[in-house]
Amino acid sequence: MERIGIFVGSFDPFTIGHDSIVRRALPLFDRLVIGVGVNEKKRYMLTAEERVEAIRGLYDGEEKISVEQYSDLTVDFAQRHGAQFIVKGVRSVKDFEFEREQADINRRLTGIETVVFYALPGMDSVSSSVGRELKNFGRDVDSFLPKRIG
């Protein structure tokens, strides 16, 4: 059976923390689908298409990775792809508590498991919101965003 994981988020923008999770998760799966979430209630710096294309460009040539947008429940997105696992990254206790609760809900709904990766040392302050803020003020974002995205 093919091991399929999904890694989802708004990725506005995709950070070095997100990239770290993808690269660390990749050896565990035969396929990893990156889902770029679209929520009509949120305002974005980048369009969904721009986010998808930026992430695709980052993993160009990586056959195990696909990237697409979605706007439904994460578990429904996972089921569409035949995924058995949802990949999540956590930076703090607050993140962990939220993701633990989401994992329980997802497991109850579909039986899908959640695989958690902890932020590497020094990456706990890396976030899309910090990357956006720095970029808006014209500051250097190299220590927050991958070179091909920043």
Task: Tell where the protein language model's regions lie, with residue ranges.
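Nucleotidyltransferase catalytic core that binds NTPs
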Residues: 1-150
